[in-house]
C-alpha cells in the first residue's frame, strides 16, 4: 500500500507540473504569440526583417504613409512626405528601430491568437491598419523649415498626448535610397531619430525652469534691476548674450531671453535648487510616446 501511495503522489506531482506547464504555455502564447510570429525565422511572414504583408500606416487625416505587399515596402507618393515621415514610419531595411513599422509590427501583421496570420477561410491575412496622430503636411513643412540642417522638429499636444509632428534630419527618400548613404558624411546618424535618440543642450528653453525657481525663491525678484553689457563672467567663464540690454528687469529679461540675467539667477539659486526644479519639471526623467 505504501508503494502504491508513493506512486500515486509522484503521478499527482507530475500531472500537476504538466498542468502548470500547459497553463504557462497558453498564457505565454496569448501574451507573446504576436512577437513569436514575427520572428525573422518565420520566412513566410518576414523578409529581411520586414513584414511580407502588413496593414496600412496612415496619418491623422488618413493619408497613406506605408504598407507592405509581397515583401516590398510601399510609401506615400510624395517624396517630401516620404522624407519627412521616414523616422516615424521606418525604412525598407528595418534599420530605424523607433519607427511604427517596428514598434507596431505585431498589429501590422494582423496576428490573431486563434487563427495566427491566416483567416478562418485559410487565406493569408493582409495585416491590420494603424492610424498615427502625426500630420504628414505639418511634417513636410517642418522638414522644409530645417532646410537641410541636422536636428529635429517635434510638436506634442500635452493635453491629449498626441504627437502631431516628429521630423528628424538628416533623412532620405525610402524609395530612392542614396547609393553613398553609408559613406557620405552628410548622412551620418541618418538611422537615428534625433527627436528620440539624440541629446542636445537645452538652451534658452531651460530659462523657464530658472524663472520658476527664481519666482518661488527670490522674494524681491520683481523689484530688482539687472545690468546686461552683452556678457558676464561666471566662475571664470565668459557667458555672452545676443544683445546688450543695459539695465533690465526680470520680466523683460525673460521676454528678451537675456543670458546675463539668467546666468546670474542660476548662480544665486545654486545647484541644489536648480536640480530640484529641473526634477520637478521632468527634465531628468524618461517619458514615453505612443502615437
Regions found by a protein language model. Give the residues of each.
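Periplasmic/cell-envelope proteins involved in peptidoglycan metabolism and beta-lactam response
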Residues: 1-181, 190, 199, 272-280
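Beta-lactam-recognizing serine transpeptidase/beta-lactamase-like catalytic domain environment
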Residues: 61, 159-203, 209-291
Amino acid at each position: 500500500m505504501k508503494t502504491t501511495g508513493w506512486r500515486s503522489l509522484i503521478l499527482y506531482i507530475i500531472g500537476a507540473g504538466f498542468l502548470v506547464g500547459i497553463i504557462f504555455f497558453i498564457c505565454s502564447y496569448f501574451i507573446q504569440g504576436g512577437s513569436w510570429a514575427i520572428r525573422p525565422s518565420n520566412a513566410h511572414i518576414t523578409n529581411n526583417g520586414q513584414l511580407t504583408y502588413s496593414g496600412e500606416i496612415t496619418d491623422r487625416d488618413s493619408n497613406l504613409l506605408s504598407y507592405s505587399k509581397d515583401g516590398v515596402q510601399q510609401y506615400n507618393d510624395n517624396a517630401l512626405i516620404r522624407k519627412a515621415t521616414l523616422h516615424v514610419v521606418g525604412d525598407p531595411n528595418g534599420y530605424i528601430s523607433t519607427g511604427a513599422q517596428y514598434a507596431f509590427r505585431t498589429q501590422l501583421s494582423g496576428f490573431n491568437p486563434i487563427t495566427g496570420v491566416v483567416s478562418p477561410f485559410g487565406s493569408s491575412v493582409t495585416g491590420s491598419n494603424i492610424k498615427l496622430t502625426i500630420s504628414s503636411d505639418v511634417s513636410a513643412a517642418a522638414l522644409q523649415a530645417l532646410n537641410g540642417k541636422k536636428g529635429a522638429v517635434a510638436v506634442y499636444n500635452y493635453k491629449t498626448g498626441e504627437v502631431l509632428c516628429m521630423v528628424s534630419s538628416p533623412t532620405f527618400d525610402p524609395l530612392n535610397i542614396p547609393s553613398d548613404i553609408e559613406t557620405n558624411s552628410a548622412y551620418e546618424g541618418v538611422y537615428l531619430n534625433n527627436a528620440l535618440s539624440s541629446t542636445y543642450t537645452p538652451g534658452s528653453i531651460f530659462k523657464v525652469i530658472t524663472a520658476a525657481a527664481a519666482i518661488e525663491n527670490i522674494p524681491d525678484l520683481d523689484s530688482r534691476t539687472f545690468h546686461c553689457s552683452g556678457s558676464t563672467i561666471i566662475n571664470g567663464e565668459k557667458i555672452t548674450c545676443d544683445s546688450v540690454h543695459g539695465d533690465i528687469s526680470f520680466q523683460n529679461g525673460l521676454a528678451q531671453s537675456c543670458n546675463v540675467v539668467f546666468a546670474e539667477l542660476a548662480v544665486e539659486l545654486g545647484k541644489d535648487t536648480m536640480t530640484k526644479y529641473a526634477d520637478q519639471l521632468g527634465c531628468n526623467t524618461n517619458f514615453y510616446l505612443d502615437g
